[in-house]
Amino acid sequence: MTERTVLVTGGTGGLGSAVTAAFLDAGWRVVVPQREAGTDDGPVRVVADLLTPEGAARAVEVATAEPAAPLRAVVNLVGGYAAGGLVHETPVEEFERMLRLNLRPTYLVTRAALPHLVATGDGAVVCVSARAAVSPFPGASGYVTAKAAVRAFADAVAVEYRQRGVRCNTVLPSVIDTPANRAAQPDADHRRWVPPAQIAGVIRFLASPESAPTSGAGIPVYGRA
């Protein structure tokens, strides 16, 4: 019988599908919020708009609905990328969109889940930021700022909840080897990119009891990039 539930936001994307599969393979009950109804193919799917407090609360409600498998972990994958030129060339709306898309769901879902994670006495939050948060590149100030904010938020959660039995860590991937990224960068050396399954393994470890001593860490997952 499954004894643990993980809530995986962004669980249907290139990385998210690998993360979902990794937890299912390890015997977790996996809850995946999505904007539209999907097929029942393993994880528990819930229609929820994670940009709203109500949507985040709905996702957590489903994740905590099985008493035999209490919510033990939240994995925040929702995000997005857009280039915007130099700072003075980037429209304000685009800068704000990057912040909203990358930071707001992470904040809302984590906020809604924390009381339940505290109640278990052994909860974990894993936030996916990006290498750009610590090694910025030009032409994407909104994205860089948003991913840095995700890491800072995770650090704040780690400090505030360490003594309450909840740990929080951040994963910092470089370029992820997904079909979408290959299509966007067909001439890149894809051998240097990180396969989603390898990142998923790191995330699953950080959500597991084996990582109990670790909180407030930023884990680089760069491959050979």
Model-derived regions: residue spans:
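Residue(s) in the substrate-gating loop at a strand-loop-helix junction
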Residues: 130
